[in-house]
């Protein structure tokens, strides 16, 4: 913005006798012969001005002409003419004159006075201007203040609502710099002068700040404001013209209940079966996918019999005698320990140990034209794991790509060659359970080992107490008591033989959990020197390691074998497992078996 000296007599005459304001407001006086009209230079240096208010504001004939170049101390020397669009800071510098009386040259009007000052008729579309010069006959720069009312509204409906920014845009506020920015109005005790001026000012008769300005015609809504997202460019264009490439429609649940009907897709998926029927691992399933076990020698059946048979013999011979002659608490407590032992055995044997889904990270197919001797993509990598013992320390642990399952194994995950599955946090494959011991069934395995040890010791002690009490009551020798109760004596021998093995496993795994390691990690660490052995997953001490393993909740299964099969599930095969060839490992991975036709599935 520039202030220029006018040499035109007409201009001086107009300056001395300014035209009256439309609202009757007094105009500021001229200072030192400088034109009271603040002219704004156009962005391109041309005299491009719009005459949008020529029909409402009297036309002024006073035009400031360019004088000689001003001196260095001149006011106009602070402004420069440029061809590029000015920034917000440059636009503010055109309207702010700190060297002169600001109240005499610049009085920003409030939104109410500015709307009344315009007085232009309503239009069907939002009026927007392209010139950024702050000219007096130009629209306001606020997008909300432009007229957006349709022609069908009456004059009463066109009444402009009051602005919410009156406190900061009112022209009679002299202490603009000292305004209170606190969200509460009681932070100061001294009342600002601007508050008194706002309270005592004379409000225009046609404005009422307490009235909610709404159009009487509710059928016709005003056009969208330029700030609305619905008024963006090409918003009214047909939807077919949109580029929908790489877009996917998200599914959402119904907001209201509908009639329960079986959809064709759901019925079709149910006809295809469940997920376990398409699983390609070396696993057998029972109970509709609820129970699973490795397709190997069923040693777990023998393990269950080793628990069931002695328990049955105890309740058949020693239990009734102990109930009536010593205490009923002995057989009851023995039954409770047996329940814990056998239930933990069932859970550890038939529960999903943590099978990782297959085909999640498939390698790209090999190009036939590529050199067959070329090195393929890497199958080993390192993953940084944050240590629980420090806030800043971390350690790299190796991870490997499983070519059988086509996945990058997470840390502590290994592929079991018996189950032919990648198991999360695999400890070992237990032949007594005929199942892998992983993250989801490790607690059941540890509970089975612990309770089987207690059960064997309980069996030994209760059977021996039966023989000794009977010998003392009858007054016979120990050999005669054994001859009378041979089965309890056999249970004493069985308990003495069965207790050491689960007891050693219990102590060994208690030691491993206290170190924060699995069986595989502990055995693999002995391949390195003692100085190179690290435990990145330890919690710092034995108690925390025990809590982290035995106190953590069991994670959900990844495979969901009981669910219905969905066509296109990459985790599963496209053909049911009963139609796939079996026993390819004894044939050196050469499939010499009959392959059924594709339509047989």
From Swiss-Prot:
Main location: endoplasmic reticulum
Ranges of biased composition (kind: Polar residues): 74-92, 123-155, 179-195
Catalytic activity entry: L-cysteinyl-[protein] + hexadecanoyl-CoA = S-hexadecanoyl-L-cysteinyl-[protein] + CoA
Active site feature: 430 (s-palmitoyl cysteine intermediate)
Segments on the Cytoplasmic face: 1-300, 347-444, 508-601
Processing and modification events after translation: Autopalmitoylated.
GO molecular-function terms, A-Z: protein-cysteine S-palmitoyltransferase activity
Compartment(s) of residence: Endoplasmic reticulum membrane
Enzyme category, top tier: transferase
Residue ranges of domain DHHC in the record: 400-450
Keyword Cell cycle belongs to the record: no
Low complexity composition-biased segments: 1-18
Keyword Membrane: yes
BP-aspect Gene Ontology terms: protein targeting to membrane
Alphabetized UniProt keyword annotations: Acyltransferase, Endoplasmic reticulum, Lipoprotein, Membrane, Palmitate, Transferase, Transmembrane, Transmembrane helix
InterPro entries associated with the record: Palmitoyltrfase_DHHC, PFA4/ZDH16/20/ERF2-like
Signal sequence interval, chain numbering: none
Pfam families tied to this protein: DHHC (PF01529)
Residue spans crossing the bilayer: 301-321, 326-346, 445-465, 487-507
Biased composition (Basic and acidic residues): 198-223
Positions in the Lumenal compartment: 322-325, 466-486
UniProt membrane topology term: Multi-pass membrane protein
PANTHER family per record: PALMITOYLTRANSFERASE APP, ZINC FINGER DHHC DOMAIN CONTAINING PROTEIN
Function: Palmitoyltransferase specific for Ras proteins.
Domain comment quoted from the record: The DHHC domain is required for palmitoyltransferase activity.
Protein name: Palmitoyltransferase erf2
């Amino acid at each position: 913005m520039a202030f220029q000296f006018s040499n035109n007599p007409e201009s001086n005459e107009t300056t001395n006798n300014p035209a009256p304001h439309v609202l009757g407001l007094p105009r500021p006086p001229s200072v030192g012969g400088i034109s009271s009209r603040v002219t704004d230079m156009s962005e391109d240096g041309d005299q491009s001005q719009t005459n949008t208010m020529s029909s409402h504001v009297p036309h002024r004939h006073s035009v400031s002409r360019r004088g000689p170049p001003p001196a260095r101390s001149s006011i106009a020397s602070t402004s420069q003419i440029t061809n590029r669009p000015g920034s917000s800071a440059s636009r503010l510098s055109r309207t702010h004159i700190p060297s002169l009386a600001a109240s005499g040259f610049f009085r920003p009007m409030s939104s109410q006075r500015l709307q009344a000052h315009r007085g232009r008729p309503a239009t069907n579309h939002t009026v927007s201007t392209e010139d950024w010069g702050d000219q007096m006959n130009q629209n306001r720069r606020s997008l909300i203040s432009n007229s957006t009312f349709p022609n069908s509204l009456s004059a009463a409906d066109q009444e402009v609502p009051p602005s919410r920014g009156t406190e900061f845009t009112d022209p009679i506020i002299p202490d603009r710099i000292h305004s209170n920015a606190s969200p509460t109005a009681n932070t100061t005790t001294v009342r600002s002068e601007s508050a008194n001026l706002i309270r005592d000012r004379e409000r225009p008769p046609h404005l009422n700040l307490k009235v909610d300005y709404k159009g009487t015609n509710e059928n016709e809504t005003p056009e969208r404001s330029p700030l609305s997202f619905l008024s963006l460019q090409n918003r009214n264009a047909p939807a077919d013209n949109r580029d929908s490439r790489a877009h996917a429609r998200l599914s959402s649940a119904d907001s209201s209940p509908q009639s329960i009907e079986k959809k064709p897709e759901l019925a079709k998926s149910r006809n295809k079966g469940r997920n376990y029927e398409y699983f390609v691992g070396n696993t057998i399933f029972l109970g509709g996918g609820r129970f699973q076990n490795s397709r190997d020698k069923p040693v777990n059946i023998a393990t269950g019999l080793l628990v069931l048979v002695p328990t049955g013999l105890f309740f058949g011979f020693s239990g009734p005698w102990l109930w009536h002659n010593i205490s009923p608490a002995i057989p009851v407590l023995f039954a409770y320990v047996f329940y814990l032992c056998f239930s933990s055995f069932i859970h550890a044997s038939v529960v999903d140990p943590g099978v990782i889904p297959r085909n999640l990270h498939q390698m790209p197919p090999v190009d036939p034209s590529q050199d067959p001797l070329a090195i393929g993509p890497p199958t080993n990598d390192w993953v940084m794991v944050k240590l629980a013992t420090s806030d800043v320390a971390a350690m790299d642990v190796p991870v490997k790509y499983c070519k059988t399952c086509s996945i990058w194994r997470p840390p502590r995950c290994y592929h079991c060659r018996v189950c032919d599955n990648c198991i999360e946090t695999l400890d070992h494959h237990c032949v007594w359970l005929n199942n892998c011991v992983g993250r989801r069934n490790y607690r059941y395995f540890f509970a089975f080992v612990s309770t089987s040890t207690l059960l064997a010791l309980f069996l030994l002690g209760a059977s021996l107490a039966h023989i000794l009490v009977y010998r003392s009551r009858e007054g016979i020798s120990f050999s005669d008591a054994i001859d009378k109760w041979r089965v309890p004596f056999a249970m004493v021998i069985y308990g003495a033989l069965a207790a050491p093995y689960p007891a050693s496993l219990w102590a060994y795994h208690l030691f491993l959990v206290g170190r924060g390691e699995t069986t595989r990690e502990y055995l693999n660490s002995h391949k390195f020197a003692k100085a190179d052995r690290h435990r990145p997953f330890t919690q710092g001490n034995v108690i925390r390691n025990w809590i982290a393993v035995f106190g953590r909740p069991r994670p959900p299964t990844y495979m969901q074998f009981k669910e219905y099969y969905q066509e296109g599930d990459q985790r599963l095969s496209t053909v049911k497992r009963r139609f796939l060839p079996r026993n390819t490992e004894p044939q050196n991975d050469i499939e010499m078996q009959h392959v059924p036709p594709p339509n047989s599935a």
